[in-house]
UniProtKB/Swiss-Prot annotation:
Keywords: Endoplasmic reticulum, Lipid transport, Lipid-binding, Membrane, Transmembrane, Transmembrane helix, Transport. It is found in: Endoplasmic reticulum membrane. The keyword Protein biosynthesis does not apply. Component of the ERMES/MDM complex, which serves as a molecular tether to connect the endoplasmic reticulum (ER) and mitochondria. Components of this complex are involved in the control of mitochondrial shape and protein biogenesis, and function in nonvesicular lipid trafficking between the ER and mitochondria. The MDM12-MMM1 subcomplex functions in the major beta-barrel assembly pathway that is responsible for biogenesis of all outer membrane beta-barrel proteins, and acts in a late step after the SAM complex. The chain crosses the membrane at residues 36-56. The SMP-LTD domain is a barrel-like domain that can bind various types of glycerophospholipids in its interior and mediate their transfer between two adjacent bilayers. The gene is MMM1. GO terms for molecular function: lipid binding. GO terms for cellular component: endoplasmic reticulum membrane; ERMES complex. InterPro entries: Mmm1, MMM1_dom, SMP_LBD. This is Maintenance of mitochondrial morphology protein 1. It is a single-pass type I membrane protein. Residues 328-348 are annotated as: Disordered. Belongs to the MMM1 family. The lineage of its organism: Eukaryota, Fungi, Dikarya, Ascomycota, Saccharomycotina.
Amino acid sequence: MAGKADLGHTGISDNIVERQIFVPQPNNAWSFTQGLMCGQASVVVVLLVFIKFFVFSEAPPSSGAAKSKKKDISGVIVKREAKNTDDDDGVENGDSAKLATILEKTYYDVNNHNPESLDWFNVLIAQTISQLRCEALLSDNIYHSLNDFLETSDLPDFMDKITLTEIDIGDDFPIFSNCRIQHSADGTGRLEAKIDVDLSDTLTLGIETRLLLNHPRPLTAVLPVQLTVSMVRFSGCLTVSLVNTNDTDFVGTSKEENSSGGGTALMFSFSPDYRLEFSVKSLIGSRTKLQDVPKISDLVDSKLRNWFSDRCVEPKFQVVRLPSMWPRSKNTREPVGAGKTEKVNGNE
């Protein structure tokens, strides 16, 4: 009985073993794919975290951070000038110290330095004036410009249309000499250049018109008038200086000038002892003509002198705003043949 039991037990065990042997193994292919995808995803996450926190910086959360950044940037620029104080005396002392530093570093003594000739400057000015004359004479541009100005000008009722009869823009050039740097006489301590100017040339403008007598009825009488004005000589002392347009002494009267912001401007004026000579020729009448009437010459001469004195003679002055001198790509030029020359040299 025991043997049978053993045999039976052995048979059962064999069956169990056989069943265990023939049980199909589970498929692990899907588990491997999941592991591979999870591994790649984890690598991508680690790379993103590294790039975010170690490569890119965070954006400033508020305007306060931007202000602090500006303060940090301001510390990068080396400022060698002394700090300005709030009072006027401190500002004046700072400007005086700045001018003294400029004179010291340029080795210029305003009290003992000899006047300088401006031969090189005369050449540059002559080239500029020559170019302007060529442009003015090109296609009679100066005639059309003056004629358009006269046609659009408001004339009094007793004057007929003005017609141009003669234009002469000269062929000589001004001579600048005896340049010296001095402190301004107004007590501000500003540096200014005193330059002697001399021009001996003939600049002529001739016109003709008619004086209309409209009383007691329109066009009761007509008086033809021909007038030719020539400037033959000018000499004087030119004062030139650089000013800041934000200064109260140089603030413009128009809103457009004030809204354009601050900057550097060129201020110039002429001394009251200038010399200006005119030659005025007149011809009045139709049948019986009066030539070179002294009263007309004196009137024209006085009007031209007053016009010049009211604009350019001390204490009046002219202020011309200077453009920005900072190099810009839009202002960059090169010779026309430069590119072709480089290509030829490269091919060789």
